[in-house]
């Protein structure tokens, strides 16, 4: 499977016709048909319904089409960014993040980075905390903002702060009648929605460990992939969900209460390659220090 096959398939999917797609790609139709056939053999399922006019996508083909567009778009971004760096037009800083950090330190930091380094091309990549460590080692990102501690000697990490946790409750829950901090033991027996389902360890494990430390046994535990799904299920009254306090603004059709419990917090951790002294890594760390020095209580509601 290669990028050429991706481009060929996308052309056929858009044109819904092999002849027009071949003309657009400036190739003969037989080689185009052969490459699509090889692609289908490699993925193991049909992607096109050829005996219809126009050509139709199978369900698998629609999924592959959406993913192929994303892959090709990402490749184009990589090529453009690489050319800019090679021509010394712009420098690139790739930042990995978990979604919940977008509601805390990250937006302010990005604005400051652009102010101090307007020549910098900042690329944001959403990755789970565990994935960030691998991406840093592989050079796919330069900095990561996550929530899980690690032991990789090749990656340096700093805990920016310990963020308080909150519980998202259905509006009709008896616990939603109050807004005071919720004692963690009141979560005993509740249907609990945790995220992410994978990769592990992750934020879900932090939540379960906190409950275990307080000898709290939830009822049914449902695992989902991301915080947006979890909060949607809370709104639909499928259960409750523990989230970082900064994420309380994500939905307004659920009720939030801070959690009152020993070490009921989640760290916000910034990571980068060990011994990386590049100027933009140094600038990022400097700006973070300045932000906390200027506003030591700027996350009061979260700390």
Curated annotation (Swiss-Prot):
Residues 1-58 form the HTH lysR-type domain. The keyword DNA-binding applies. It comes from Acinetobacter lwoffii. Gene3D superfamilies: Periplasmic binding protein-like II, Winged helix-like DNA-binding domain superfamily/Winged helix DNA-binding domain. Pfam families: HTH_1, LysR_substrate. Coiled coil: none annotated. InterPro entries: LysR_subst-bd, Tscrpt_reg_HTH_LysR, WH-like_DNA-bd_sf, WH_DNA-bd_sf. This is Probable cat1 operon transcriptional activator. Probable positive regulator of the cat1 operon which encode enzymes responsible for the degradation of catechol to acetyl-CoA via the beta-ketoadipate pathway. Keywords: Activator, Aromatic hydrocarbons catabolism, DNA-binding, Transcription, Transcription regulation. One of its GO terms (biological process) is catabolic process. One of its GO terms (molecular function) is DNA-binding transcription factor activity. CDD domains: PBP2_BenM_CatM_CatR. It comes from the Bacteria. Disulfide bonds: none annotated. Belongs to the LysR transcriptional regulatory family. Residues 18-37 bind DNA. GO terms for cellular component: protein-DNA complex.
């Amino acid at each position: 499977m290669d990028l050429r096959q991706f481009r060929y398939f996308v052309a056929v999917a858009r044109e819904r016709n092999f002849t027009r797609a071949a003309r657009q790609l400036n190739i003969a139709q037989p080689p185009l048909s052969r490459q699509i056939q090889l692609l289908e053999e490699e993925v193991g399922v049909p992607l096109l319904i050829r005996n219809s006019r126009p050509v139709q996508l199978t369900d698998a083909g629609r999924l592959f089409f959406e993913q192929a567009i994303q892959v090709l778009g990402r490749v184009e971004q990589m090529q453009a960014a690489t050319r800019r760096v090679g021509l010394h037009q712009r420098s690139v800083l790739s930042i990995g993040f978990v979604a919940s950090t977008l509601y805390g330190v990250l937006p302010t930091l990005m604005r400051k980075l652009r102010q101090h380094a307007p020549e910098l091309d900042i690329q944001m990549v959403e990755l789970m905390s565990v994935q960030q460590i691998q991406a840093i080692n592989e050079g796919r990102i330069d900095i990561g903002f996550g929530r899980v501690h690690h032991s990789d000697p090749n990656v340096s990490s700093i805990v920016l702060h310990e963020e308080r946790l909150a519980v998202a409750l259905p509006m009709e829950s008896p616990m939603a009648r109050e807004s005071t901090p919720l004692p963690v033991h009141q979560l005993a027996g509740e249907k609990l929605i945790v995220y992410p389902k994978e990769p592990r360890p992750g934020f879900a494990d932090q939540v379960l460990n906190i409950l275990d430390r307080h000898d709290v046994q939830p009822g049914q535990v449902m695992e989902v992939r991301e915080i947006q799904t979890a909060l949607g299920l809370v709104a639909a009254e499928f259960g409750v969900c523990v989230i970082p306090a900064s994420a309380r603004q994500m939905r307004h059709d659920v009720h939030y209460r801070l959690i009152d419990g020993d070490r009921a917090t989640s760290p916000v951790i910034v990571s980068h390659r060990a011994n990386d002294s590049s100027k933009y890594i140094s600038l990022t760390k400097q700006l973070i220090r300045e932000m906390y020095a200027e506003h030591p209580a700027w996350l009061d509601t979260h700390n």
